[in-house]
Regions:
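Hydrophobic, proline/glycine-rich low-complexity stretches
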Residues: 1-59, 194, 202, 206-242
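Internal, well-folded beta-alpha domain core
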Residues: 74-242
Length: 242
């Protein structure tokens, strides 16, 4: 299937991105075949990301009644894959949280992604050039949250910075239960980011993400920022011949 075909078009906005250094060994069982864990200056990162999904359209044109605007919170890490002379830098999702069952079901069926649906809330507030964004979800009877506050104006990440590394991975990879790997392209312009002056993440990480992650969030994130976001296109997936 050609990557030129768009499966889903939307806007991703107000992306809270909290980034934690981890031992790459904890990611081993999540790494899809044909990919390898990516690193930045010798360190491996996982990211907790909360954001708004807005104006969602199937095939780039078909509006989805009652499902066009919603929030998502995910835990992801970064991989790379060689395609000929090209190195494709991508994202693997450990878990993705959305508020509607239909969205989770479509994503699981089409991409094999690890979606769950639970009640969610958000607070977005702007003050001057700054921004505060918080995303909350209810899991097993308790509310959890990811939050960041920024007081400065957003700027494009510096070339070669960690912020650029985190935001500019334009491929997604999923390991299917049958051992195959799914690859898909995500298209968007570079995002401006606010550097966070404060951040907060609360979750039962071991239960939600797996025992590998229960100790990953005891320390503050290595970096925290809010990405402005943009229009995005998620292209049809393909199964890799490995």
């Amino acid at each position: 299937m050609e990557f030129g075909r768009i499966f889903l078009a939307a806007e991703w906005r107000n992306l809270v991105m909290l980034n934690y250094r981890v031992d790459p060994g904890i990611l081993e069982r999540f790494v899809p075949r044909g990919t390898a864990v990516d690193s930045f200056q010798g360190s491996t990162y996982i990211s907790v990301v909360g954001f708004q999904f807005l104006r969602t359209r199937l095939f780039g044109r078909l509006a989805i009644p009652f499902h066009a605007n919603f929030d998502e919170v995910n835990l992801r890490f970064y991989v790379r894959r060689k395609e000929g002379e090209e190195t494709r830098r991508g994202v693997v999702f450990v878990k993705e949280i959305v508020p509607r069952r239909a969205i989770a079901a479509v994503a699981r069926f089409s991409y094999g992604e690890k979606y769950v649906s639970v009640p969610m809330r958000r607070v977005i507030s702007a003050e001057g050039a700054g921004l505060t964004a918080e995303y909350r979800w209810k899991f097993r009877g308790r509310w959890y949250a990811v939050r960041a506050e920024a007081t400065n104006a957003p700027i494009l990440p510096a070339e070669g910075s960690l912020e650029q590394f985190i935001t500019e991975h334009y491929w997604g990879y999923t390991g299917r239960r049958d051992g195959q790997t799914v690859e898909y392209r995500v298209s968007h312009v570079p995002w401006r980011v606010w550097s966070a002056s404060k951040s907060h993440f609360e979750s039962d990480a071991g239960t939600l993400y797996g025992p590998e992650f229960k100790d990953c969030f005891h320390q503050p994130p290595a970096s925290a920022f809010i990405a402005e976001g943009s229009a995005v296109s998620v292209h049809f997936p393909r199964r890799l011949a490995l």
